[in-house]
Amino acid sequence: MDEDLMGFFDFSKEFKRTEAPKGCISSNFVGLGTEKEKTKPPKQENLGTEYVKEIVDREKQNLESLGIGGSAAKRNRTLDDIDSDNEECYEAPDLRLDEEFYSKYYFDLNRDKTLPIYTQRDQIMKAIRENTVVILKGETGCGKTTQVPQYIIDEAYQNRQYCNIVVTQPRRIAAISIANRVSQERHWEPGTVCSYQVGLHRQSGSEDARLLYCTTGVLLNFLINHKTLTHYTHIVLDEVHERDQEMDFLLIVVRRLLATNSRHVKVILMSATIDSREFVQYFATKNGIPPVINASHGRKYPLVKFYRDQLKNMQWQEDQPNPDEPGMGSHGYSAAIKILLVIDNMERRTEGQSQRSYEENLKTGSVLIFLPGINEIDNMAESIDHVMQENPALKVSIIRCHSLMTPDSQRDVFASPPVGYRKIILTTNIAESSITVPDVSYVIDFCLAKVLVTDTATNFSSLRLVWASKSNCRQRAGRVGRLRSGRVYRMVPKSFYMKHMLEFGVPEMLRSPLESSVLKAKELNMGPPIEMLALALSPPKLSDIRNTILLLKEVGALYPTVDGNYVELDGDLTPWGSIMTRLPLDIRLSRLVLLGYVFNCLDEAIVMAAGLSVRGLYLQEAGFQSYEAYWMHYVFADGSSSDLVAIWRFYKTYLNMCENRIMQESAAQWARRYHISLRSLKEMHLLVQELQYRCNKLRLHPVQLQSCQIKDDRERALILKILIAGAFYPNYFIRSNKFNPDYGRNTYQVLGGYDPCRTVYFTHFEPRYMGELYTRRIKDLFSEAKIPPENMDVNFQVGSEKIFVTFKQTEDEMDQLNLIQVPGRILTDVYKAVRLRIGKQYRPIRVMELPHAIQYVQENKIGTVIEGQWHPPSKPFNAGLMALPSVYDKNMIGYITHIVSCGKFFFQPLELADSITNMSEHINSPKNLSHYVVDAGSITKNLKLLAKRVDDFQRAQVIRVETHSHQYPKFRVRFIDYGDIAVVPMDQLRFMSNQLKREYDDLPPRCFECRLALVQPAALTSNYNRWPIKANEMVRKIAMDGRVEMEIYSLVNNVAAVFIKMREGVLNDKLVEKNYARRSDEDFASIQDHDFRLRKQERSFHVPRAERKQVNEEYLRVSRLPQDADLSPPPMHKCQTVVRLKGPYSPLEASMFSTIRASACKTVRIDPLSVNSVLLDSNPQDRHDQLIVSASVTTSNNNQVLTVRGSTVMPNTHGFGALMALIFCPTVQIKCNKECTKFVSLLAGLGYNPETMEPYYEDHDVVMNLDVNLLEDDVRLINQMRYNIDTIFFKYEGEDAPAVSEGDRSIVFNQLRCLLSRLLSKDRCYIEPHSSNLDNVWEKLDNLEPQSEPYGKRAIFPMHTIPELQNEDTTARLVLQENCKRLYSWRTFDGVLQPLDCKLCNQRLETVSQLRLHLLSQLHRDREKQIGFQDN
């Protein structure tokens, strides 16, 4: 590299000061709530196919010289001589003799004469000899696929002429099975004369192959690489009617090469339902048209078709179907069931008139019902089940058939039904051609289908319901009549079928992404993509081509320019684009693989890409199976909140099973247990192997040096999420922001003050039902989620219809090893509970009406009834005995007795030391230790007893039996007064004497639980929001030193948030300095309690002692954990009323919104199969936005609801989303506030036209408003990262290999790793929200000097221009300080507050409560530091 490159990031150089851009204007909080211009999606310009005519006319001039359809010219040259485009090559070459080959293998010229195709053999061969292109139309089963290539090779054998035939198949399995079948028929060794190739896998020993069966993509890639057809003498394109995108592009290439350098290669097009007129016109020239040969045959059994209007006695209740609104109608299901009843009655009546009995007819009288999707299949099955209950005589066996069915279900499709039952197969269009069931005699066809349609402007796809084509319907009708005559019932009128239904379906090229075709056009290098795609059989719209090219520029496959000049409809191929053409993946998945190579996680990236490419990895099941499947998948996610990480982890498990040679049965059992399709997993495994092979061929290898290996799972988890964020930009979604100052308050109000991280609620329970009687029944509702009843408390609120269920944090620390890991502070049980509702919204329980309930409690003396009002029994509470800190205690001294983590440790106040010592001496007296435990069965869960701790016995409570050995039973116990847990053998346990029980049984613990305040684990150094080991060790060291002084921040639910004081400062701050923690807000309840404590402590000197005691007792009563009465419910026979509870709900259920303009104002939901389908605000105390990245996005038919698939929740690192956008976007404008003192928003995308100021790709422009401080140095670090990524792939002109050697690549990788660590480990200050109508407007930045571009126009990731920030104006700072003083002056006001504005944080404060809590927020405290304010 030259000196400019080496010194590019030398920060010692002087930077030129320039004027910053006129960016966003800060708005007040009220302004944030108004709709802005940016929320409106951009208008899309829809350009049609007008461009096609000019290009097609020009192409025709090239075809004029070729006589397609005329006689073949005399062959007097060899194939090797016709690679030139010279007119002299017009004459056909003489094919060389191949005597040696034919003498090497056995050739039997006797073909199967029973096949219908044989009668047309001579006509077919004559047409092939005399024409360049031949179209062959023959029904399925006529023999065209296997026989026509053999006819050609037989004729070549007879003439001893060289021939080389390639036959394309749309599916891998077809190519393999047909090749093997032909080899078997001809008695050739597999892979010799006849061979196959799928992907890069070619049958071994195929050097002599003269007949190759391959997938469409194999031939297409071969022709693109060689740019000639002359490697083959005959090209047979089978199943051309399917019109997938690869086939349509292959037709373009074949026709172009026929017209240029391959004029004497023979092309045969074959299909069962081909639109011969369309193909004839496509290959026609002035010299003639290709001949069409029909090789169809008659049916063995008759087929009768019925239409809706011909079924007069069905009494249809609906209007005519609407051509523009496909659907089954409200009575579609019942109409189909009527037909089933008619079929059954008809066969019963004709039993005596035919030779077949009714039972025999049932065996061959299966019914195939074509439905558009899985939901419709489920609805139809439910409707049939309902009718069967009403008509016991109708006995049917229902089989579901769709692309995601399990292998067992596939076998059921072909199996005979039980004796006396009729088989009914409910199927999607998969049974049109892929599955043939011989015993089907009836088809009920709703004439509907679902097709995947992609909007190229947004790159969002949707599964749309459409009317099936007539071709589809003919294929469906062909499924009947294999064993006897058949009937087809089409559920549309005949006139509708004839007039409104299309003859053929819409080709894939007109409804699917064009990225692959555009990249292939670039690789073919025969003109711009627009000129190639205009030659398609069905050319796409110009707007679709334009959007596709813009998308390819966005992902780095194309440069924005051609030869250095910007071209909207073209771009030079980048190294990334060249690699993408060689990977059998979607472009974003290819980008994932490329970034895996960059960050040395290639194998992981390949596995995730393969998993996303294979359909049906997860089995789709209903009911409890669906609930269980979700959690089995969640286990593999391992707390990462990532579908992609789950894929990688369960593939690793599968691979280990394969490597350890675990039996096939074990693998099948494992797959069933985790609800994974073993068939799809095997398919994924093959794709992983192919991708690894292709990457190896492309010289994409992981760096093997030890210094480049990822250190641990924590670093790998972070890098994998960075790969995902980079690969799927701009599929960025933000979990709804929480700038509403009442967010925390509202959350707690919904739950009646209970902890939202542990509580869910039901609705629709009227207060009159005396809910405390049914707590156990309510707990039983969670049995499906396997949540033990003792792990929850059920509470009610007076006058409310809600039921609150609060889950307990397990007492057993070993549960941290639980298979289900969830992120953040929320308990796993909350996720389990909310997931229950997704499967079933209503939960019934049986209750008594009020008069009967009152009578019941009075008879059984449960609680008290006062003036007709029932008061359930409650446990006594003595605040004076609690070890908890008083509301007036700011600091406490004592001992840390047990440490789980920085987020959970136990503290004994020094003031209780004497009483604890006395109690210990009393307990350990010989008299009180004489009550030995001799029977392990007498030890029950939650029993209080004495257990040995170190040298003495202490109070303990049994958690569970640890071992069941009769000789050495052990028990897991929690020491009540110390907080620790231990496994204690039975001989170290003692029962409490009656005297000890009276004295200590009801005595509250002599310690209380604590956690560190205003900090949480740093995402960069922790997994699952768990505290790093080194952080916990710092707490242990302090505890071992003896007495500890703590400052109490708050007390909520008996847990104190504290600051631990050290000689060097405060532990909380030290953890932040060492990057073990980051600063964090407290949740609403904690801040509210802190404010309450502050105000009480400020006035404590003026409060009498008695009043202080009373205030503290009430304070501790409110702060304690909820406890229910846990009463036995009334007998079921007395509970005659059924209440349908709705829920459970959590107020932390989060919504999210898209960051790109095309998705503005659209509802976003997560795929129900995703591990993130239960999306909760896992850190409700954190006011920052959190990024969610999606591998793909689908949209509803009305284009208003987006479904996120393959989602990953990014680390809760403040500013993570903005940093990822800056690293991986094509270009960005960083916008400042009006004073130019800070960056406030990003506008990322492809940029804009400097002449018109119009954005290049407005639909995909991303706007991100910053909520943390981003500095100029951060952008410089990001520019270094972008430079390093480009360096890895940079090639010198004329070179095939990158300029970076393997050794240099390791240096680049370690630099990237170091830069990432520096970027993400910063503890960023909060900034106030800014929002402006200019956020989404690209602005001219002539006053900013652009950054130097080391790679010029060849940069995939060009350098970002960095606006220069100004120092904050002193006058403005004084104004903000004055505003701050005014806010503090109103803090103690007790009246009604006039609304105030916090100018520091850009927020409107409506009440004193809002004001107080805002002043304690991390945002406000950070802003105070930034302006140098201190409250006196």
Swiss-Prot record:
GO MF entries: ATP binding; ATP hydrolysis activity; RNA binding; RNA helicase activity
Function: Probable ATP-binding RNA helicase which plays a central role during spermatogenesis and oogenesis by repressing transposable elements and preventing their mobilization, which is essential for the germline integrity. Acts via the piRNA metabolic process, which mediates the repression of transposable elements during meiosis by forming complexes composed of piRNAs and Piwi and govern the methylation and subsequent repression of transposons. Involved in the repression of LTR retrotransposon copia.
Chain ranges of the Helicase C-terminal domain: 342-525
One Pfam assignment: HA2_C
Species assigned in the record: Drosophila willistoni
E.C. number(s) listed in UniProt: 3.6.4.13
Name of the featured protein: Probable ATP-dependent RNA helicase spindle-E
Signal peptide boundaries: none
UniProt GO BP: dorsal appendage formation; germarium-derived oocyte fate determination; global gene silencing by mRNA cleavage; heterochromatin formation; intracellular mRNA localization; mitotic chromosome condensation; oocyte karyosome formation; oocyte localization involved in germarium-derived egg chamber formation
Ranges for domain Helicase ATP-binding: 125-292
Family: Belongs to the DEAD box helicase family. DEAH subfamily.
PROSITE patterns reported in the protein's UniProt record: HELICASE_ATP_BIND_1 (PS51192), HELICASE_CTER (PS51194), TUDOR (PS50304)
The organism's place on the tree of life at top rank: Eukaryota
